[in-house]
């Protein structure tokens, strides 16, 4: 009788395969933050699509659970209210609802991490830490003007600017804060002194990067996270049986003066003491110019909320609302497509009742979880990361970007896991395939419509001629196509009616000077003198310098009020 052969793979082969899977999944969490792809009319599209592809791959590689029913209800309510606010305009509410669906899928992954224990939860910590450390290095190279050799894998901004591949200093700072939470958790759950020394070094690098960002949002995150961590560390040391140990409170609190010392030194090293590089200390002293300040922005948004308090202006309508409004006081001078405060943004676009339902639902979830009683180290990490994103959302809009949607969903699932994972485990492959299909189609369509924004010699061969006609029928990026069509069309007596109608639609997508000029010129040719004068008045109020430039160029037309 022959010898029986085992069907079980030897441990020596299983272990490398398991490690390879862990490395792959860690990379999938980190990659959205590191994606260097930027092309076409909307710079964050590729980052969002890469985030969806990584999310789909994570769904396929598991583990997948299911968040609590309250989470499903909260996300579903948000999607429903957004869709109802822009009923019929798929290009407006569709992307927002897809983003909410992506967050929902990420919550299933977060719940799966809980079910697989601490080892699986380290996926989130390691992925965010890798992204944070790589971005910190890129940011410091950018800060000192040394990133040029790495283009196109990163950007090379002006001296003294650091933002990695996120292209915005507050997003960069929030990533550093997420990585700071990861370092603290990994330190607390590790017994190896060598590992702890490595994590301490990583923490110093993150601290330097945070100072280089000159982000006031990042400073608030650092102060709050470090302060809470020091309090937890003190509580740990009051009991002699604590299993997990953060660094001593005195060392944690030392990072705060160290941060300010680094913030003082960095610009002097970059600018040679000439003052050419703005420091964090200067930003805290001077703040933003009055007509660019958040306080003025929020006053304008509150005025808009008061005009439509119950139903809002509609999803995606803030930019048009701000342009068309006449304020009694000062006016925020830029195109305002976000309120830079999530509750206020929901109120101005969806209405106060919808904002109360969405924000109140989230607050109910938080209060029911009682974070102030939390002792589990994995959940403490989740609370820290969630806090960094929530704080940022009170000052800007990180949840409009794929990497932060992914981490936000993972944290929600980790903190509010459901009881049963079986239904979602079965649905995960289908959700992953759907995400890949949507991302693939959107990527193809975006490449196609982006051709009109390129010089003829840089376009794909099949789009070199008659480009606009070939890309006109886009289902996802219809606004970008119509914007290109409008700006490329000369207004004549023959096409004035069509241009006027198109300009009116595009005003709700991007109410910028070149669109306003087309609207005024077409109204003039159609004999709508009063409409042209009213629009010119709005133009002068919203963009005075652009209006003056246009008047100098068209002094003989006589349509100014």
Predicted segments, located by residue:
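Hydrophobic transmembrane alpha-helices and their immediate junctions
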Residues: 352-380
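Alpha-helical transmembrane segments of multi-pass inner-membrane proteins
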Residues: 25-38, 44-61, 79-86, 95-109, ...
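Flexible juxtamembrane loops connecting transmembrane helices in multi-pass membrane enzymes
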Residues: 162, 225, 262-298, 378, ...
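Transmembrane alpha-helices of multi-pass inner-membrane enzymes
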Residues: 182, 221-229, 378-429
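A membrane-periplasm/extracellular boundary helix in multi-pass inner-membrane enzymes
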Residues: 212-213, 218, 233-286, 429-430, ...
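Loop-to-helix entry and N-terminal half of a specific, functionally important transmembrane alpha helix
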Residues: 28-32, 202, 337, 341, ...
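Membrane-interface segments at or immediately adjacent to transmembrane helices
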Residues: 440-514, 518-519, 531
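TM-adjacent membrane-interface loops and short helices in multi-pass inner/ER membrane proteins
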Residues: 168, 295-336, 343, 350-356
């Amino acid at each position: 009788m022959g010898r029986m052969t085992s069907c079980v793979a030897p441990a020596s082969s299983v272990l490398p395969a398991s490690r390879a899977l862990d490395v792959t999944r860690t990379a999938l969490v980190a990659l959205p933050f590191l994606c260097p792809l930027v092309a076409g009319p909307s710079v964050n599209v590729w980052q969002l699509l890469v985030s969806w592809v990584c999310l789909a791959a994570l769904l396929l590689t598991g583990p997948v659970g299911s968040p609590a029913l309250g989470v499903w209800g909260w996300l579903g309510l948000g999607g429903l209210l957004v869709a109802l606010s822009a009923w019929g305009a798929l290009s407006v509410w569709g992307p927002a609802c897809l983003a909410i669906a992506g967050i929902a899928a990420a919550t299933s992954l977060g719940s799966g991490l809980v079910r697989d224990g601490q080892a699986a939860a380290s996926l989130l910590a390691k992925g965010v830490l890798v992204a944070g450390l790589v971005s910190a290095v890129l940011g410091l190279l950018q800060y000192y003007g040394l990133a040029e050799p790495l283009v196109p894998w990163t950007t090379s901004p002006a001296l003294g600017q650091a933002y990695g591949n996120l292209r915005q200093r507050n997003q960069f700072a929030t990533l550093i804060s997420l990585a700071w939470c990861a370092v603290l958790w990994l330190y607390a759950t590790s017994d190896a002194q060598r590992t702890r020394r490595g994590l301490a070094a990583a923490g110093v690098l993150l601290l330097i990067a945070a100072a280089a960002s000159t982000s006031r949002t990042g400073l608030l995150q650092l102060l709050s996270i470090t302060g809470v961590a020091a309090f937890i560390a003190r509580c740990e040391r009051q009991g002699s049986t604590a299993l997990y140990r953060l660094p001593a409170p005195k060392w944690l609190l030392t990072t705060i003066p160290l941060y300010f010392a680094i913030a003082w030194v960095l610009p002097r090293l970059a600018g040679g003491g000439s003052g050419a590089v703005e420091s964090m200390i200067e930003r805290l002293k001077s703040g933003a110019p009055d007509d660019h300040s958040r306080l003025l922005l929020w006053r304008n948004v509150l005025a808009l909320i008061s005009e439509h308090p119950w139903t809002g202006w509609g999803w995606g309508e803030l930019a048009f609302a701000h342009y068309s409004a006449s304020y009694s006081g000062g006016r925020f001078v830029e195109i305002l497509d976000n309120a830079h405060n999530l509750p206020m943004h929901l109120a101005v676009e969806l209405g106060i009742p919808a904002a109360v339902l969405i924000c109140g639902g989230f607050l109910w979830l938080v209060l029911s979880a009682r974070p102030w009683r939390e002792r589990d180290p994995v959940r403490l990490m989740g609370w820290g990361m969630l806090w960094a994103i929530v704080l940022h959302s009170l000052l800007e809009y990180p949840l409009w970007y794929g990497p932060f949607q992914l981490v936000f969903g993972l944290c929600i699932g980790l903190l509010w896991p459901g009881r049963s994972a079986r239904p979602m485990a079965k649905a995960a492959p289908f959700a992953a395939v759907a995400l890949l299909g949507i991302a693939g189609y959107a990527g193809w369509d975006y490449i196609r419509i982006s051709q009109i924004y390129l010089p003829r010699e840089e376009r794909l061969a099949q789009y070199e001629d008659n480009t606009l006609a070939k890309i006109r029928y886009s289902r996802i990026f219809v606004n970008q196509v119509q914007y290109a069509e409008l700006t490329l069309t000369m207004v004549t007596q023959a096409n004035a009616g069509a241009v006027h109608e198109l300009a009116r639609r595009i005003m709700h997508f991007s109410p910028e000077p070149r669109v306003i000029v087309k609207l005024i010129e077409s109204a003039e040719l159609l004999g709508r003198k009063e409409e042209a004068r009213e629009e010119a008045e709005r133009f002068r109020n919203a963009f005075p310098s652009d209006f003056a430039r246009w008047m100098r160029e068209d002094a003989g037309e006589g349509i100014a009020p």
